[in-house]
């Protein structure tokens, strides 16, 4: 007679084994209808799985994130069901859940057109609307293998042979005549899978290995109700408008080309933006008392062997050779910073030592993963490393956290998710050292009033870390900042300082990044602002334009005056209609357009228009300069028009 404890602490006793669906029915018909699965003693199970002993149970519905993931996983199986009806010779590979959706890799002897994709989605909807039950069956390894051999599912057979133990009992899920293999859980009935759409296709190598066959990958998204689906699709539409690649081309910021895959060609305006961002970071480095250094962009392979990077990261490193020596182009800055620390004797009185670099790094990312500024091979890290004593860790982490929020706040990011990753099973350092380090990180977050989530076992082998993830205006997550403790690298590279008792002590090293990659952060900002960068950051802050040739001299002198005041300004003296000029510079997202006619020349004023289409009227030249200088220096996100 199992006793079931519910999330609110209440208990229900049953005279026989029950399933989560039985428990939901006992609570009420509404919950039974909404029940997708159960969480039994912390583990997700199917709605029909039998519980024979006392247990803690939560009923999973479409309102839960876990419920949405189950719906998406079942939609992947639904895709398999539909495609096998339309193209029976298809061989199914894997169909996992991904962020906000799912995909299925399959071997299809047919080039899928957009019409085919539409047909496939239509068949999926027809099947889902039948609201058939999904039947779960646990079988022996041999039974599962025999079933998939009989169906000609070579990839499922390979998964069984290579990834599943012979004494295991795989789960088979029956969608009418279609059978798929999965750990589950899945929806009990297809009425939960009505709100989905297929999105795109791509190629994907079997098991991610380019030596294997290229499979077809079909992507889709699925949600708990129509409103959620429509909201997501609207976000996708808005995201497409904000795509940094599209805006980057419109604003002539940068370009990429095949001869340098994953490397950025910065144009004048893009490089102006980059340097302004760099200036801002440099100002913050000074405020938080960092040294700025510059290390070489490549070093002998021997050094990377000492750090452990060669053993664990070699496939991501570019190499070159000269005079019988092999060099690695650096994928990160930390080994170089330890070399700088090692120059000259250091005392505990010299610590903490905060060392920052705009490091030019390169990583050999797969060509298929490259994506504009968001995923590149050559990038600049706003990287820093803090060398300190164990007693200083907490204060230094506190300082890093303050700097993170200070900088993110300038850009208007207010929703920040924070995760603390703790000790993994395989690690270096004693439990005492790890315990204190984890406590220091948690205490620093708590002292700053920051809510965070633990990620047990997700820390690196050399230390725990804090991750900062930004949520943008479309609620997309961008993991940018990290504060990572390192108990390993300083010792590997013989770093030490002289302690209070005149002994050699290995310093604790804190890896700290805030923006992460400068290139990627510019991509994030471009999409966050849709190209409407704040005035302090935008490449051209003001355009001064004449109505007729009579104002040309006035425009030229005013442009010089604005430039001397530290404002990035251009003059537009073209013989074009003023409406044409305004439209053109509005499309270029120039914050302020100063129009000069005869009246403005006579009164020593300018007519001010904004890129948002607001007319601020006629303003005295010195007054507008003062206001612009204040907006730029304060790095205010809100413009004069607002």
UniProtKB/Swiss-Prot annotation:
<dbReference type="InterPro" id="IPR047246">
    <property type="entry name" value="ThrRS_anticodon"/>
</dbReference>
<dbReference type="InterPro" id="IPR012947">
    <property type="entry name" value="tRNA_SAD"/>
</dbReference>
<comment type="similarity">
    <text>Belongs to the class-II aminoacyl-tRNA synthetase family.</text>
</comment>
<dbReference type="InterPro" id="IPR012676">
    <property type="entry name" value="TGS-like"/>
</dbReference>
<keyword id="KW-0067">ATP-binding</keyword>
<dbReference type="GO" id="GO:0005524">
    <property type="term" value="F:ATP binding"/>
</dbReference>
<keyword id="KW-0963">Cytoplasm</keyword>
<dbReference type="Pfam" id="PF02824">
    <property type="entry name" value="TGS"/>
</dbReference>
<dbReference type="InterPro" id="IPR004154">
    <property type="entry name" value="Anticodon-bd"/>
</dbReference>
<keyword id="KW-0479">Metal-binding</keyword>
<dbReference type="InterPro" id="IPR012675">
    <property type="entry name" value="Beta-grasp_dom_sf"/>
</dbReference>
<feature type="binding site">
    <location>
        <position position="334"/>
    </location>
    <ligand>
        <name>Zn(2+)</name>
    </ligand>
</feature>
<keyword id="KW-0820">tRNA-binding</keyword>
<keyword id="KW-0694">RNA-binding</keyword>
<dbReference type="Pfam" id="PF00587">
    <property type="entry name" value="tRNA-synt_2b"/>
</dbReference>
<keyword id="KW-0030">Aminoacyl-tRNA synthetase</keyword>
<dbReference type="InterPro" id="IPR006195">
    <property type="entry name" value="aa-tRNA-synth_II"/>
</dbReference>
<dbReference type="InterPro" id="IPR036621">
    <property type="entry name" value="Anticodon-bd_dom_sf"/>
</dbReference>
<keyword id="KW-0547">Nucleotide-binding</keyword>
<keyword id="KW-0862">Zinc</keyword>
<feature type="domain" description="TGS">
    <location>
        <begin position="1"/>
        <end position="61"/>
    </location>
</feature>
<dbReference type="GO" id="GO:0006435">
    <property type="term" value="P:threonyl-tRNA aminoacylation"/>
</dbReference>
<feature type="binding site">
    <location>
        <position position="385"/>
    </location>
    <ligand>
        <name>Zn(2+)</name>
    </ligand>
</feature>
<comment type="function">
    <text>Catalyzes the attachment of threonine to tRNA(Thr) in a two-step reaction: L-threonine is first activated by ATP to form Thr-AMP and then transferred to the acceptor end of tRNA(Thr). Also edits incorrectly charged L-seryl-tRNA(Thr).</text>
</comment>
<dbReference type="GO" id="GO:0005829">
    <property type="term" value="C:cytosol"/>
</dbReference>
<feature type="binding site">
    <location>
        <position position="511"/>
    </location>
    <ligand>
        <name>Zn(2+)</name>
    </ligand>
</feature>
<protein>
    <recommendedName>
        <fullName>Threonine--tRNA ligase</fullName>
        <ecNumber>6.1.1.3</ecNumber>
    </recommendedName>
</protein>
<dbReference type="InterPro" id="IPR004095">
    <property type="entry name" value="TGS"/>
</dbReference>
<dbReference type="Pfam" id="PF03129">
    <property type="entry name" value="HGTP_anticodon"/>
</dbReference>
<dbReference type="InterPro" id="IPR002320">
    <property type="entry name" value="Thr-tRNA-ligase_IIa"/>
</dbReference>
<feature type="region of interest" description="Catalytic">
    <location>
        <begin position="243"/>
        <end position="534"/>
    </location>
</feature>
<dbReference type="InterPro" id="IPR002314">
    <property type="entry name" value="aa-tRNA-synt_IIb"/>
</dbReference>
<dbReference type="InterPro" id="IPR033728">
    <property type="entry name" value="ThrRS_core"/>
</dbReference>
<dbReference type="InterPro" id="IPR045864">
    <property type="entry name" value="aa-tRNA-synth_II/BPL/LPL"/>
</dbReference>
<keyword id="KW-0648">Protein biosynthesis</keyword>
<comment type="subunit">
    <text>Homodimer.</text>
</comment>
<dbReference type="GO" id="GO:0046872">
    <property type="term" value="F:metal ion binding"/>
</dbReference>
<dbReference type="GO" id="GO:0004829">
    <property type="term" value="F:threonine-tRNA ligase activity"/>
</dbReference>
<dbReference type="InterPro" id="IPR018163">
    <property type="entry name" value="Thr/Ala-tRNA-synth_IIc_edit"/>
</dbReference>
<dbReference type="Pfam" id="PF07973">
    <property type="entry name" value="tRNA_SAD"/>
</dbReference>
<keyword id="KW-0436">Ligase</keyword>
<dbReference type="GO" id="GO:0000049">
    <property type="term" value="F:tRNA binding"/>
</dbReference>
């Amino acid at each position: 007679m199992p006793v079931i404890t519910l999330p609110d602490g209440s208990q229900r006793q049953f005279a026989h084994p029950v399933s989560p669906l039985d428990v939901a029915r006992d609570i009420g018909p509404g919950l039974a209808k909404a029940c997708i699965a159960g969480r039994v003693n912390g583990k997700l199970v199917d709605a029909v799985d039998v519980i024979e002993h006392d247990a803690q149970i939560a009923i999973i519905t479409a309102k839960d994130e876990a419920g949405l993931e189950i719906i998406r996983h079942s939609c992947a199986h639904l895709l398999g069901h539909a495609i096998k009806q339309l193209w029976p010779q298809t061989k199914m590979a894997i169909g996992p859940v991904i962020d906000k959706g799912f995909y299925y890799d399959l071997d299809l002897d047919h080039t899928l057109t957009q019409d085919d994709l539409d047909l496939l989605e239509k068949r999926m909807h027809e099947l889902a609307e039948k609201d058939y039950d999904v039947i779960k069956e646990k079988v022996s390894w041999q039974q599962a293998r025999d079933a998939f051999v009989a169906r000609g599912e070579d990839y499922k057979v390979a998964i069984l042979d290579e990834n599943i133990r012979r004494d295991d009992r795989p789960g088979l899920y029956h969608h009418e005549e279609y059978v798929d293999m999965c750990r589950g859980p899945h929806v009990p009935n297809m009425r939960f899978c009505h709100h989905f759409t297929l999105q795109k296709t791509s190629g994907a190598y079997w098991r991610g290995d380019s030596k294997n066959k290229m499979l077809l990958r079909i992507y889709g998204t699925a949600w708990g109700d129509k409103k959620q689906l429509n909201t997501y699709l609207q976000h996708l539409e808005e995201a497409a408008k904000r795509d940094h690649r599209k805006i980057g081309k419109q604003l002539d910021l940068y370009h990429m080309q095949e001869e340098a895959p994953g490397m950025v060609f910065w144009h004048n305006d893009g490089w102006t933006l980059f340097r302004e961002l760099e200036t801002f970071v440099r100002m913050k480095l000074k405020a938080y008392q960092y040294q700025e250094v510059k290390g070489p962009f490549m070093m002998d392979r021997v050094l990377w062997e000492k750090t452990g990077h060669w053993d664990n990261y070699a496939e991501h490193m570019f190499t070159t050779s000269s005079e019988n020596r092999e060099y690695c182009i650096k994928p990160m800055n930390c080994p170089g910073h330890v070399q700088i620390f090692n120059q000259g004797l250091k005392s505990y009185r010299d610590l903490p030592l905060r060392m920052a670099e705009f490091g030019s790094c390169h990583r050999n990312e797969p060509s298929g993963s490259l994506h504009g500024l968001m995923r590149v091979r050559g990038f600049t890290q706003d990287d820093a490393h803090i060398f300190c004593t164990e007693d200083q860790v907490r204060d230094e982490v506190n300082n890093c956290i303050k700097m993170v929020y200070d900088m993110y706040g300038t850009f208007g990011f207010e929703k920040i998710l924070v995760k603390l990753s703790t000790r993994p099973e395989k690690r270096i350092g004693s439990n005492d050292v790890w315990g204190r380090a984890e406590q220091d990180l948690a205490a620093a977050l708590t002292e700053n009033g920051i809510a965070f989530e633990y990620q047990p076992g997700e820390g690196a082998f050399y230390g725990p870390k804090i991750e900062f993830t930004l949520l943008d205006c479309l609620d997309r997550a961008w993991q940018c900042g990290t504060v990572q403790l390192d108990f390993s690298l300083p010792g590997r590279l013989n770093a030490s300082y002289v302690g209070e008792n005149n002994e050699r002590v290995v310093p604790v090293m804190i890896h700290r990044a805030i923006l992460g990659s400068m290139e990627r952060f510019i991509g994030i900002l471009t999409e966050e602002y849709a190209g409407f960068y704040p005035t302090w950051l935008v490449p051209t802050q003001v355009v001064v334009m004449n109505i007729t040739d009579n104002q040309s001299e006035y425009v030229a002198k005013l442009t010089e005056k604005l430039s001397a005041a530290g404002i990035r300004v251009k003059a537009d003296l073209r013989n074009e209609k003023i409406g044409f000029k305004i439209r053109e510079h509005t499309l270029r997202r120039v914050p302020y357009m100063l129009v000069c006619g005869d009246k403005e020349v006579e009164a020593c004023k300018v007519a001010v228009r904004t890129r948002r289409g607001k007319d601020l009227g006629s303003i005295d030249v010195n007054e507008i300069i003062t206001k612009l200088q204040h907006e730029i220096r304060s790095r205010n996100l809100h413009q004069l028009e607002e």
